[in-house]
């Protein structure tokens, strides 16, 4: 027995997991942010696949991958390197800010102060201070030295907040000395604070759409902003006004990078262009390159002769920067200024494909996906593995070909936001315990021909995902009874990430399948796992069967239609129609039945009629024919499949029965047909 902690105020929970390889060396979706450690040439990239990756930019080899930093479970929106490259701070759509050991790549602590997506970070190098902001309109200030000192026992941290924002914040910037912090939001204005006092200084109007990117000058006197309105604006904080508006892009400006002397702006846009512009003379501009997708972030290479760029795609490219040369002699003997040639791709870190389409097959076990490179793949949701790589085949044709005429209730949903298939289990709109199937249909490789076992997909999967979880304070099993872990049929990959989160809300816990055996993880699961999970995984309770009511009546062509009244019955929805045939023979026609295989259902026991008759040795489905909506029903179909594909009505399912030509019955129907609701 396990005493599970419950909380009346706890929000409804869901469990999700990702079907993926043990090591994902390539980004599988767009890359939102970059940070370069110029001391060792390491480039950190924040992916929409929820993974931060580290690359060696000093090698000319195509294999630049060093390691992955994994603990987020949604887009990583921003990252900053601090403490001379020893630590990294990240912000994510999973509503958390995380502190990392940048050298070893592990998560040191998680900050859960934000209540919505955390979109942006800002860093004051001289003060070792970080600010975070997001869609909850909040800005929090963090002391980095305090964050990096957090431990399991010393896990209390205080933060200062900057108030006054009235809308979602998408951009944030501080100068190195930490005297000015600026935010940009869907208010279309810039708000400025003094982070030393948390006092609001001013707000600046001028943009007409969301302010997506910001840079503050080292002295804190100037701010450069980029907006979805397509403009770049230069602001003088002393004058509290815009002093320059630059129009070099056709669409929104999403990323800005400044030269060290704050004279040149490198901008990346939704129009896919990266442009260098002289700030004081915007007519002096040049196109660095046209990327393959909208530009999300920019960062210098080690010697600042090139710029790394990320986009909606998963590749990371480095482009040579043109230089502005003022020492060119013109034909009249004067001096001209012109740009040297740039725009050459000098390096590329290749990314992987993102899954863009997904179809759940009717058997509700397999899904078929199509990625950004048109590759089609079949995944086994139950076993959490990639089953088959089909290549660049016709996606729609494969879905149609592999869909069987079988109906199983939806028991999971699929989320493709990260570019990898994330499977979500819950108890809300989709009940993860709704899919009962026969073991023959669900796990044919585990079939024992002497049994008619029914399995529940959701129960089996949760047991496999939490196989290694031994809750604290659980009573040791009886020595005569084995301590059952897992589901007894199969295991899932140990590297699979499992996430517990609030429905439509925040992440509460993330761990790998193999890590559930750890003491801290076990305790965290004990405090986090919802009751519906512990009921099946720990208490080994059986989910409830779903019932279907239906009517049974003689077919008009019956030889002896003595009884025409409908009789209403109720059965488990996964009961196959051959069981209904057995019921007709046994209870309606008073004939002896031979079960179709295995042990008959308790409510469908053999009658006591003559067992020596030749007809009684035939299975019921060879003696009785079931009809529904003027269609002969396959005896292998279950009730829910008949209702979905043949009946197709909201009213109770109705069957008509008649004997086949090779079978005649002499029994009197009489009172053998039950007039009351019968449960199978």
UniProtKB/Swiss-Prot annotation:
Sorted alphabetically, the keyword list is: Repeat, Ubl conjugation pathway, WD repeat
| UniProt keyword Coiled coil present | no
Per the record, the domain of life is: Eukaryota
For molecular function, the Gene Ontology terms on record are: ubiquitin binding
Q: Where are the WD repeats?
A: 26-65, 71-110, 113-152, 164-203, 206-245, 248-287, 290-329, 350-389
The positions making up the signal sequence are none
Which InterPro entries did the record assign? Answer: G-protein_beta_WD-40_rep (IPR020472), WD40/YVTN_repeat-like_dom_sf (IPR015943), WD40_repeat_CS (IPR019775), WD40_repeat_dom_sf (IPR036322), WD40_rpt (IPR001680), WDR48 (IPR051246), WDR48/Bun107 (IPR021772)
Question: What segment(s) does the record annotate as region Disordered?
Answer: 592-616
Give the multimer and partner information. Catalytic component of the Usp12-46 deubiquitylase complex consisting of Usp12-46, Wdr20 and Uaf1; regulatory subunit that, together wtih Wdr20, stabilizes Usp12-46. The Usp12-46 deubiquitylase complex associates with arr/arrow; the interaction leads to deubiquitination and stabilization of arr/arrow.
Family per UniProt? Belongs to the WD repeat WDR48 family.
Q: What does this protein do?
A: Regulatory component of the Usp12-46 deubiquitylase complex. activates deubiquitination by increasing the catalytic turnover without increasing the affinity of deubiquitinating enzymes for the substrate. The complex deubiquitylates the wg/wingless-signaling receptor arr/arrow, which stabilizes the receptor and increases its concentration at the cell surface; this enhances the sensitivity of cells to wg/wingless-signal stimulation.
Protein name, entry field: WD repeat-containing protein 48 homolog
Annotated organism of origin: Drosophila sechellia (Fruit fly)
């Amino acid at each position: 027995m396990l005493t599970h902690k419950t909380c009346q105020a706890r929000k409804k929970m869901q469990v999700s997991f990702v079907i993926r390889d043990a090591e994902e060396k390539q980004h599988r979706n767009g890359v939102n942010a970059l940070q370069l450690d110029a001391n060792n040439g390491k480039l950190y990239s924040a992916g929409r696949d929820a993974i931060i990756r580290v690359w060696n930019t000093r090698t000319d080899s195509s294999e630049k991958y060093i390691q992955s930093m994994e603990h987020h479970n949604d887009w990583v929106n921003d990252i900053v390197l601090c403490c001379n490259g020893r630590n990294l701070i990240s912000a994510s759509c999973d509503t958390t800010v995380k502190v990392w050991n940048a050298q070893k790549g592990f998560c040191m602590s998680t900050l859960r102060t934000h209540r919505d997506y955390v979109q942006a970070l800002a860093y004051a190098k001289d003060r070792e201070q970080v600010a975070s902001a997001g869609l909850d309109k909040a800005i929090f200030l963090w002391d980095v030295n305090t964050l990096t000192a957090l431990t399991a026992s010393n896990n209390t941290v205080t933060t200062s907040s900057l108030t006054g924002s009235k809308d979602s914040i998408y951009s944030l910037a501080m100068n190195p000395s930490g005297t000015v912090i600026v935010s940009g939001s869907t208010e279309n204005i810039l708000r400025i604070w003094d982070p030393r006092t948390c006092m609001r200084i001013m707000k600046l109007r001028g943009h007409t759409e969301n302010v997506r990117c910001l840079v503050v000058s080292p002295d804190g006197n100037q701010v450069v902003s980029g907006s979805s309105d397509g403009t770049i604006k230069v602001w003088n904080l002393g004058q509290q006004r815009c002093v320059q508006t630059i129009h070099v892009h056709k669409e929104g400006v999403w990323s800005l990078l400044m030269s060290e002397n704050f004279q040149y702006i490198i901008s990346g846009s939704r129009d896919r262009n990266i442009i260098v512009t002289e700030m004081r003379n915007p007519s002096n501009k040049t196109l660095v390159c046209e990327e393959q997708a909208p530009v999300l972030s920019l960062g210098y290479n080690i010697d600042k002769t090139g710029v790394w760029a990320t986009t909606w795609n998963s590749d990371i490219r480095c482009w040579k920067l043109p230089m502005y040369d003022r020492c060119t002699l013109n034909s009249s003997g004067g001096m001209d200024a012109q740009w040297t040639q740039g725009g050459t791709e000098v390096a590329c870190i290749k990314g992987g494909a993102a899954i863009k389409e997904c179809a759940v097959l009717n058997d509700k076990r397999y899904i078929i996906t199509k990625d950004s490179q048109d590759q089609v793949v079949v995944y086994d949701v139950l076993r959490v593995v990639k089953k088959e790589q089909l290549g660049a085949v016709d996606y729609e044709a494969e879905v149609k070909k592999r869909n069987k005429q079988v109906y199983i209730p939806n028991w999971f949903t699929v989320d493709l936001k990260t570019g990898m298939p994330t499977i979500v289990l819950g108890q809300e709109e989709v009940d993860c315990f709704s899919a009962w199937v026969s073991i023959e249909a669900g796990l044919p490789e585990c079939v024992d021909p002497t049994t008619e076992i029914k399995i529940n997909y959701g129960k089996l999967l949760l047991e496999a995902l939490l196989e290694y979880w031994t809750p604290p304070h659980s009573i040791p099993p009886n020595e005569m009874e084995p301590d059952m872990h897992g589901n007894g049929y199969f295991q899932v990959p140990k590297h699979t990430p499992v996430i517990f989160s609030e429905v439509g809300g925040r992440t509460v816990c993330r761990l790998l399948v193999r890590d559930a055996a750890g003491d801290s993880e076990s305790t965290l699961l004990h405090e986090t796992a919802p009751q519906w999970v512990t009921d099946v995984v720990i208490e080994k309770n059986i989910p409830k069967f779903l019932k279907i009511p239906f009517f049974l009546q003689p077919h008009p062509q019956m030889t002896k239609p003595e009884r025409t009244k409908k009789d209403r019955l109720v059965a488990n929805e996964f009961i196959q129609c051959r069981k209904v045939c057995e019921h007709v023979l046994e209870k309606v026609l008073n004939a002896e039945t031979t079960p179709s295989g295995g042990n008959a259902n308790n409510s469908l026991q053999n009658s006591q009629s003559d067992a020596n008759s030749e007809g009684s040795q035939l299975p019921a489905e060879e003696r009785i024919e079931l009809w529904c909506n003027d269609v002969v029903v396959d005896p292998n179909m279950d009730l829910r499949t008949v209702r979905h594909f043949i009946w197709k009505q909201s009213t109770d399912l109705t069957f008509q029965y008649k004997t086949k030509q090779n079978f005649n019955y002499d029994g009197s129907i009489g009172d053998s047909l039950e007039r009351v609701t019968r449960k199978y």
